[in-house]
Amino acid sequence: MPTHRNWPTWASLSCNPSLAAAALIGLIILVSATIYFSTATVLPRIDHTDMKQVDLGRRLYASSCASCHGASLEGQPNWQRRLATGRLPAPPHDSSGHTWHHPDSILFGITKLGPAAYPEGHQTDMPAFGKSLSDAEIAAVLAYIKSNWPVEIQRRQSSLNEKR
């Protein structure tokens, strides 16, 4: 049975580049797996047919989202044209926008994390709601938004979730 005396030393690693590379790769995999599994979030249930969840989402949307995305989910005018700041206006969440082009995991991440959910360098005025809304409340807002889409849009967006 090996003991700690059989483990490679730093000196032996420096003399054997293959062993050093293997040790480094192993360390990177271990650290990456630890970070991934300790921060992975289980997506809460987002059910646009659950009227209790939808009603909560409607109230939360009105108080947290409507000021930018519109009381009727219509978004800001000219939402596809950049502002002088280089940022895009808030998009609509009705069927005329692109919200339904994304799976629930992306929508949830953007709502919870705000700018941190976007690729590096992307600028947005979308705030992070992870500190002001619980995961269940974010899910309720998304359920409310989805409940306003036509059935065909709901079906198409749902198929994006199945592909993940």
What is the role of each PLM region?
Residues K163-R164:
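Short, solvent-exposed mixed-charge patches
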Residues I28-L43, A71-E74, A90:
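Short N-terminal helix-initiation segments at or just after the protein's N-terminus
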Residues R82-S147:
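Extracytoplasmic electron-transfer domains, predominantly the class I c-type cytochrome c fold
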Residues M1-P2:
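N-terminal intrinsically disordered, acidic low-complexity segments at the extreme N-terminus
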Residues A22, G26-Y36, S105, P127-S159:
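C-terminal capping alpha-helices of c-type cytochrome domains
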Residues Y36-L60, R155-Q157:
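Electrostatic cytochrome c docking/interface patches
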Residues K52, R58-P89, K112-H122, S147-R155:
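Periplasmic/extracellular electron-transfer cofactor-ligation site
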Residues N6-I25:
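N-terminal Sec-pathway targeting helices
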